[in-house]
Structures are given as structure tokens and as C-alpha cells.
Amino acid sequence: KESAAAKFERQHMDSSTSSASSSNYCNQMMKSRNLTQSRCKPVNTFVHESLADVQAVCSQKNVACKNGQTNCYQSYSTMSITDCRETGSSKYPNCAYKTTQAKKHIIVACEGNPYVPVHFDASV
């Protein structure tokens, strides 16, 4: 079974590019990362930074998660991210996404030993 840490990497890490390559980026990535297999995942964020830099956020600014849990951490610096949001015309299995490039602080939930990101909570 896929670990929570591995799932985070599959769903949210794209270190190979510094930003979204085109307006079609989300359509391609959401499909290739299996985020449209059983349904269209409505919203998803990809982070264009090294895995080490994203894992390091787990020792940065401790903040409350959206659900009230206390194991969320905000990055000290802004990171290059791409937000993928389902469009109004999107219909499973033909999931369609709008690609939005940004530089923001990320907030991730961390757990385990080693203490690593397992959930992408927000960007600010």
C-alpha cells in the first residue's frame, strides 16, 4: 500500500519543473499522477521545489491546520506552486482543469518518523 508520505509526493511534488510548462499542465499532471482515476479531484496543488526543501517545512513555522489539528507547518519562504482547479465544464472521465501559477508560502501537515509532509493543507 502507498504510504502517506509517498502519496504526498505523487499528489503534490513536481521538482522536475520550476513552474507550470503550459496552460495544459494541470490536465496532463492530474491524469499522469492518477488524480482522476475514480473521480475528478476538484482542487490540487503541485510544488515546484526540491523534495528536501518541502520536507524541511516540517521543522518551520508551526500553525493550526484547517481541520483544527496542530501538526501543520508553514514555509518560511515562498515556493513556486501550481494550483489546479476543476473547470465548470469538467465531467468525469474527461476531467478538465485551470492551471494557475503562483509563488506562495505552503502549509503542510507532517507526521511519522522521519517527520515528513503527508497532507497539503493550504497556500498563503
UniProtKB/Swiss-Prot annotation:
<feature type="binding site">
    <location>
        <position position="10"/>
    </location>
    <ligand>
        <name>substrate</name>
    </ligand>
</feature>
<feature type="compositionally biased region" description="Basic and acidic residues">
    <location>
        <begin position="1"/>
        <end position="13"/>
    </location>
</feature>
<feature type="active site" description="Proton acceptor">
    <location>
        <position position="12"/>
    </location>
</feature>
<dbReference type="GO" id="GO:0050830">
    <property type="term" value="P:defense response to Gram-positive bacterium"/>
</dbReference>
<protein>
    <recommendedName>
        <fullName>Ribonuclease pancreatic</fullName>
        <ecNumber>4.6.1.18</ecNumber>
    </recommendedName>
</protein>
<comment type="subunit">
    <text>Monomer. Interacts with and forms tight 1:1 complexes with RNH1. Dimerization of two such complexes may occur. Interaction with RNH1 inhibits this protein.</text>
</comment>
<dbReference type="GO" id="GO:0003676">
    <property type="term" value="F:nucleic acid binding"/>
</dbReference>
<dbReference type="Pfam" id="PF00074">
    <property type="entry name" value="RnaseA"/>
</dbReference>
<feature type="binding site">
    <location>
        <begin position="41"/>
        <end position="45"/>
    </location>
    <ligand>
        <name>substrate</name>
    </ligand>
</feature>
<feature type="disulfide bond">
    <location>
        <begin position="58"/>
        <end position="110"/>
    </location>
</feature>
<feature type="binding site">
    <location>
        <position position="85"/>
    </location>
    <ligand>
        <name>substrate</name>
    </ligand>
</feature>
<keyword id="KW-1015">Disulfide bond</keyword>
<dbReference type="InterPro" id="IPR001427">
    <property type="entry name" value="RNaseA"/>
</dbReference>
<feature type="glycosylation site" description="N-linked (GlcNAc...) asparagine; partial">
    <location>
        <position position="34"/>
    </location>
</feature>
<keyword id="KW-0540">Nuclease</keyword>
<feature type="region of interest" description="Disordered">
    <location>
        <begin position="1"/>
        <end position="24"/>
    </location>
</feature>
<keyword id="KW-0325">Glycoprotein</keyword>
<dbReference type="InterPro" id="IPR036816">
    <property type="entry name" value="RNaseA-like_dom_sf"/>
</dbReference>
<feature type="binding site">
    <location>
        <position position="66"/>
    </location>
    <ligand>
        <name>substrate</name>
    </ligand>
</feature>
<keyword id="KW-0378">Hydrolase</keyword>
<feature type="binding site">
    <location>
        <position position="7"/>
    </location>
    <ligand>
        <name>substrate</name>
    </ligand>
</feature>
<feature type="disulfide bond">
    <location>
        <begin position="65"/>
        <end position="72"/>
    </location>
</feature>
<keyword id="KW-0255">Endonuclease</keyword>
<keyword id="KW-0964">Secreted</keyword>
<dbReference type="InterPro" id="IPR023412">
    <property type="entry name" value="RNaseA_domain"/>
</dbReference>
<keyword id="KW-0456">Lyase</keyword>
<dbReference type="GO" id="GO:0004522">
    <property type="term" value="F:ribonuclease A activity"/>
</dbReference>
<dbReference type="GO" id="GO:0005576">
    <property type="term" value="C:extracellular region"/>
</dbReference>
<feature type="disulfide bond">
    <location>
        <begin position="26"/>
        <end position="84"/>
    </location>
</feature>
<dbReference type="GO" id="GO:0016829">
    <property type="term" value="F:lyase activity"/>
</dbReference>
<comment type="similarity">
    <text>Belongs to the pancreatic ribonuclease family.</text>
</comment>
<comment type="function">
    <text>Endonuclease that catalyzes the cleavage of RNA on the 3' side of pyrimidine nucleotides. Acts on single-stranded and double-stranded RNA.</text>
</comment>
<dbReference type="InterPro" id="IPR023411">
    <property type="entry name" value="RNaseA_AS"/>
</dbReference>
<feature type="active site" description="Proton donor">
    <location>
        <position position="119"/>
    </location>
</feature>
<feature type="disulfide bond">
    <location>
        <begin position="40"/>
        <end position="95"/>
    </location>
</feature>
